[in-house]
Amino acid sequence: MYKLTLCILTLSFLLLSGLSNTVLARVQYESPSQRNKIGKEVWDQTLLRDLKIGASGSNSGRAPSCNNSCKPNRP
């Protein structure tokens, strides 16, 4: 009976101490209105959507010496 009581008390202590650790380890969420500088916060999807980066398409084509030899052979 003594071992069972000691085991239950130990497990309860470990469970309760683990709960306080998870509360302390949580990351606090900041709404977009609270953000001051871009360098401080984590780059998430909302920041990436806000940044508009324009890039022109590629003008590359096939090499002039590549006739039919560049195409893969299919059985």
From Swiss-Prot:
Main location: membrane
Keyword Cell membrane: yes
Motif extent (SCOOP motif): 52-66
Keywords for the protein's UniProt record, in alphabetical order: Apoplast, Cell membrane, Cleavage on pair of basic residues, Membrane, Secreted, Signal
Motif mapping: SxS motif essential for MIK2 binding: 56-58
Localization (cell): Cell membrane; Secreted, Extracellular space, Apoplast
Membrane found in the keyword field: yes
Polar residues composition bias: residue spans: 56-75
Any GO molecular function: LRR domain binding
Region forming the signal peptide: 1-25
Region Disordered: start-end pairs: 54-75
Tissue-specificity statement: Mostly expressed in roots.
Task performed by this protein: Brassicaceae-specific phytocytokine (plant endogenous peptide released into the apoplast) perceived by MIK2 in a BAK1/SERK3 and SERK4 coreceptors-dependent manner, that modulates various physiological and antimicrobial processes including growth prevention and reactive oxygen species (ROS) response regulation. Inhibits root growth.
Subunit annotation: Interacts with MIK2 (via extracellular leucine-rich repeat domain); this interaction triggers the formation of complex between MIK2 and the BAK1/SERK3 and SERK4 coreceptors, and subsequent BAK1 activation by phosphorylation.
Protein name, UniProt field: Serine rich endogenous peptide 20
Lineage: Eukaryota, Viridiplantae, Streptophyta, Embryophyta, Tracheophyta
